[in-house]
Amino acid sequence: MQKSRLFIIPVLLGLMCQPGLVFAKSNPPQLIENQVVEAACGECQFHLKGKGCNLAVRINGKAYFVDGTGIDEHGDAHASDGFCTTIRKARVSGQIVNGRFQASSFELLPFSGASY
């Protein structure tokens, strides 16, 4: 028993010293300031996996669910100009954290009549 402990301790210490082998690094939050993005229902328009209809934005070609404001705070999602029916433009600020957009501001821009 004592000999096996003497063997295991140096092996574990060696593994812990290998950079990137044991501990994964988390990505720092990506800051978004006053950027015009696409906004829509994540499930209906951006085909994200989820339950029900939830607000999402597409930033630089990638869609993220939104925290800090909800789909129902911006009108009827199922109206002709709603998030489930069309993709809208919004001016946003916030940060991307753990694959979600944390909105500090979200301004829905006027509907032009065309889906983006």
PLM regions: where:
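Boundary at the C-terminal end of the N-terminal hydrophobic targeting segment
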Residues: 22-26
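Structural detector for short beta-strands of small beta-barrel domains
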Residues: 29-53, 58
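Short, isolated positions in well-ordered beta-strands
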Residues: 64-65
